[in-house]
Design a protein with these regions (language model features):
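Glycine-rich anion/phosphate-binding loop at the beta-strand->alpha-helix junction
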Residues: 50-53, 57-146, 150
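Alpha-helical scaffold segments in soluble metabolic enzymes
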Residues: 38-45, 79-86, 161, 165-174
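Short alpha-helical "patches" and their helix-cap loops
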Residues: 2-11, 100, 176-183
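Internal helix-turn-beta structural module
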Residues: 131-183
């Protein structure tokens, strides 16, 4: 089982390609080599202007086993949401195709080859990669409002390892529960 988390958007600049090997090779943990410099510029521009920017972090769990989670009270999605939304500055979460699922027809959304569910159906992992995205708000401490001192213009890079850790905690908790139940 492997957990990857990376920036897919900083401010208004988003990446389209995911290169998992590139994540640890850049300061903002972007996954798109071509968008990285634009994302970095977005942060530097915000800093120069005395402002801040937020972003979106994508989290992928590869090789997650089937059957983690419960259908009602201990859904895997609910536990990930609770853990990840407890991180300061996280303002939203989506799984798989997320909010865009509201605009799809059932025949489009239920395509098992495309993993629109993000690896979780009915609160239980289905063996596909688990895919989540979390929205990170821009820091509120900015020079534009007269706040002095050192403040990060973007906390997305700092939030990524925290998101990985919270994801790992929930995953291990469900692995232990599953192992106990399946004895």
């Amino acid at each position: 089982i492997k957990i990857f988390a990376y920036a897919i958007q900083i401010g208004n600049v988003g990446g389209e390609k995911v290169d998992l090997d590139f994540i640890e090779k850049n300061s903002i943990r972007a996954a798109d080599k071509t968008a990285y410099k634009k994302m970095e510029k977005e942060i530097l521009d915000a800093k120069r202007d005395g402002d801040s920017v937020g972003g979106i972090i994508e989290i992928i769990i590869k090789n997650a086993p089937k059957g983690l989670g419960e259908p009602v009270f201990d859904k895997l999605t609910a536990d990930f949401a609770k853990a990840l939304c407890s991180i300061p500055a996280i303002k939203g979460i989506e799984f798989g195709s997320g909010f865009s699922a509201a605009t799809k027809k059932g025949s489009e959304q239920n395509d098992p080859k495309k993993n629109h569910s993000g690896g979780i159906l009915g609160g239980i992992s289905n063996g596909d990669d688990i895919i989540m995205r979390i929205a990170v708000k821009p820091p509120s401490s900015i020079r534009k409002f007269g706040v002095s001192g050192r403040h990060d213009p973007c906390i997305v890079p700092r939030a990524i390892p925290v998101a990985e850790a919270m994801t790992a905690i929930v995953l291990v908790d469900h692995l232990l529960r599953n192992k106990t139940i399946c004895l």
